[in-house]
Amino acid sequence: MSNRVVCREASHAGSWYTASGPQLNAQLEGWLSQVQSTKRPARAIIAPHAGYTYCGSCAAHAYKQVDPSITRRIFILGPSHHVPLSRCALSSVDIYRTPLYDLRIDQKIYGELWKTGMFERMSLQTDEDEHSIEMHLPYTAKAMESHKDEFTIIPVLVGALSESKEQEFGKLFSKYLAEPSNLFVVSSDFCHWGQRFRYSYYDESQGEIYRSIEHLDKMGMSIIEQLDPVSFSNYLKKYHNTICGRHPIGVLLNAITELQKNGMNMSFSFFQQASWRRRMGAAAV
């Protein structure tokens, strides 16, 4: 049996964010130093996955709520941008590299998830092509640096799930969300507007286009704060907002709903929507 350790390279370093460890560390420290921790310790966060030039300061609002002293496992749920998936997929590697330090995948939890029969395996090529998970790795490493040898990650690529599948995966992940030492990171940008995205919703009553987009996204964020997956699904059906992480968000909302059935109380708060011309937000449970 081979004991070879398989690594996923930081394939977007040098383009979506700097490949220089010292420079990246300084950038992350700068963004984090500008925000306060008001919901700490968070049990789940939603943060964007665009290039750090566009979303670095926004993501800091979410990662500032992470408490490294109690967090031991970090589930990272990112949408699939390049391959069609009707389920969720697990990585085939052991280590995710970042310019700061390497992050270890929790093979014990991976084994538990794989045994359910609900998951696929993504190839290394698919893994390295996808940015939705990778963009959270440097921030994860930075937020956890004081306990960097004491935590593992559980990356999950989320496909175009049906509502029933979102419920199934939400129920599965709810037992992990219930554990205080586990953190869920949901990777999502909000509205993608224009010909490139085949989406041009415009409410003239809001004035300029960016104001219409701002109103649309705020509406979605308000519904997410209600922690009601049905209302969120209805919002998407009505407005077709191009929230790329809608399925990971749906899974998280269904996991929370499952816990609420058992009496657990949670609240969700959006901290910042950054520049509305960039249409991003950060949130924490």
From Swiss-Prot:
The keyword Phosphoprotein applies. Pfam families: Memo. GO terms for biological process: regulation of microtubule-based process. Keywords: Phosphoprotein. The modification Phosphotyrosine is found at Y210. Coiled coil: none annotated. Interacts with ERBB2. HAMAP family: MEMO1. Belongs to the MEMO1 family. May control cell migration by relaying extracellular chemotactic signals to the microtubule cytoskeleton. Mediator of ERBB2 signaling. The MEMO1-RHOA-DIAPH1 signaling pathway plays an important role in ERBB2-dependent stabilization of microtubules at the cell cortex. It controls the localization of APC and CLASP2 to the cell membrane, via the regulation of GSK3B activity. In turn, membrane-bound APC allows the localization of the MACF1 to the cell membrane, which is required for microtubule capture and stabilization. This is Protein MEMO1. It comes from Bos taurus. The lineage of its organism: Eukaryota, Metazoa, Chordata, Craniata, Vertebrata.
